[in-house]
Regions:
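Terminal-region recognition feature
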Residues: 6-8, 41
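Bateman/CBS regulatory modules and CBS-like beta-alpha motifs in cytosolic regions of diverse proteins
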Residues: 9-33, 62-101, 106-109, 113-116, ...
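Active-site cofactor/substrate anionic-group-binding motifs, chiefly glycine-
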Residues: 21-58
Length: 184
């Protein structure tokens, strides 16, 4: 990005809305503030085509790990939160708000989805209950490369907010939401 002359008379005349007509705008650059620009923000904004300026007071090795992390993320599917069936409701609840999709994918040792856990699934259970006792095992697994419009309709028809995405071997590679399918 190089500053140059443009025909835009005012910053108020700039339209950053996406071409998909869902009413969101794309941030071009995220500020280099410690509370704003981090690993998760960099991943999300990069997936949408924006830039993140990491704070200058972060050690170089941390910046390198953030950049490596972002470069290894899937360009369409969101990074899922994964836990084992023997992990607890408390562990899931402490992680579930780390991602906008609001789900934890319960996987086996080979990263194959076994179930899905939402905050609503925790109702009536104590925090030490293991996930295999409360997770939903009726999964809609999306195959990598599936048509995004079909994904949206499948999620809508089954009234799901998110679903795991698997590769040909059935291993988890991401998570997709209705909103994510629309935006991609």
């Amino acid at each position: 990005m190089v500053p140059s002359m443009s025909n835009v008379g005012s910053r108020l005349d700039v339209d950053l809305s996406t071409p998909d007509n869902i009413g969101t705008t794309i941030p071009l650059v995220v500020a280099n503030m410690t509370a704003v620009a981090g690993r998760r923000m960099a991943e999300t904004v990069s997936r949408r085509g924006g830039l993140v300026v990491l704070p200058q007071d972060i050690p170089l090795d941390v910046i390198e790990s953030v950049v490596d992390f972002v470069k290894t993320r899937h360009p369409i599917y969101e990074t899922p939160i994964t836990l084992a069936p023997t992990d607890t409701v408390g562990e899931a609840l402490s992680l579930i708000h780390k991602r906008a999709h609001g789900v934890v994918i319960v996987t086996d040792n080979d990263q194959r989805p076994l179930g899905i856990f939402t905050e609503a699934d925790a109702g009536g259970y104590d925090r030490f209950t293991q996930l295999h006792n409360v997770m939903s095992t009726e999964l809609l697994c999306i195959q990598e490369g599936a048509d995004l419009e079909e994904i949206f309709h499948a999620l809508s028809n089954q009234r799901l907010t998110a679903a795991p995405v698997t590769n040909k071997e059935g291993r988890l590679i991401g998570c997709v939401t209705r909103r994510g399918a629309l935006r991609s």
